[in-house]
Amino acid sequence: MNTSVKKFVENKNFKKKLFTPGPASLLYENITSIEPCFGRGDYQYQKIENNVLSKLKKISNHKNIARMQGSASFALEVMINNFIYGKLLIIKTGIYSDRLLSMSIACKTNFKKIKKIDYIDYQKIDELTTKYDWVMGCPVETSVGLKIPISKLNKLKKRCKAKLALDATASIGLE
């Protein structure tokens, strides 16, 4: 392990206090593993991409994965506009669930696939048994430092006879 890089990372992370859950902004592994990648025709890039996609397929139990480059918000728009339909329950947890609500309302207005949206506080989900097509939420709501176990959301999904869609864009390393 390169101690000068490790000290650099420690010093940078020490200078700025983060009061949200999750790993530090600057990680030793990110600094030491970074390398230039071109994409098309780049063997090293292809090797890394294949490794990542193989792991994603394994943990998600999917045969195929569509990959796109973009922000977390873009990923959520893709999810909502392409998969969510019918009667939707969004779990209210904070700013990021508000973003899901806003995007879902836009999708409902523009594409008419979403028929009804209920927005219910996370503290009330144990009471729910209403049938939905989809349950959507943010298991890690960094705006308020909240983490809801995915297993709890999975139980809700089963009670509501729904599919589960999660905004896990802020939860890397926190599950």
Residue ranges and their predicted role:
Residues 109-117:
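Short beta-strand elements in bilobed, periplasmic/extracellular small-molecule ligand-binding domains
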Residues 120-173:
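Active-site phosphate-binding strand-loop segment of PLP-dependent enzymes
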Residues 18-20, 66-69, 113, 136-137, ...:
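General beta-strand structural signal in soluble alpha/beta enzymes
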Residues 32-78, 82, 99, 103:
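Conserved N-terminal alpha-helix of the aminotransferase class I/II PLP-enzyme fold
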Residues 83-98:
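Conserved PLP-anchoring active-site segment centered on the Schiff-base-forming lysine
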Residues 64, 87, 133-134:
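Structural motif
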Residues 1-43:
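N-terminal "arm"/small-domain region of PLP-dependent enzymes with the aminotransferase-like
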